């Protein structure tokens, strides 16, 4: 991994729900990224000890009283970063690195996502996992998202639903309001490309937990499919 020089130009935002078993390792790894000034965890209505585990690992934690979905959690995290930048009287806002809560120790490998943004070569980077795991029922949702992005923009992403992304603050603001729930990644790609912003994929050695094929996993995929379809319906 090319870590790049240490700086404080990036704020890591981690939406999390019921991830008490993995969030501590994810936060610890993210705090070790050379460009990371702070890790913000947004506890999106967890019923377990996610918030306490994240806080004990060194994250700044903000919490939704009820589950509001990934898009809302990303907006809450970005607002927390804005307030921090304002409090520190920064001349320019920090870039935003969004990571999933279940990356665990592999979050330490997210540095390459920040490099094109820090260098001014990209407005948003999207991770492409070098090693993928088979996710139950995932193909349909990925196919829908990828086809929708291609139809809307002419670009075919390798991993359209990958949530590991680094954005400039200006790019994030250009995409607001974010799409609802699990449609946020699909909408981000379409909205930024349509506005002429630079989006690039970056291969990284990250990995997260497979969701399996059980009933709970299938319900999750159904929610994803619904949210992606809703995001596309308003953009095609």
Outline where the language-model segments fall.
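Conserved donor nucleotide-binding strand/loop of the catalytic core
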Residues: 51-90
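Hydrophobic helical membrane-anchoring modules
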Residues: 1-6, 177-236
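Short beta-strand/loop segment that forms part of the nucleotide-sugar
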Residues: 14, 27, 36-45, 62
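Cell-envelope/extracellular polymer assembly enzymes that use nucleotide-activated donors
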Residues: 9-11, 38, 187
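A conserved acidic beta->alpha catalytic loop
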Residues: 43-52, 103
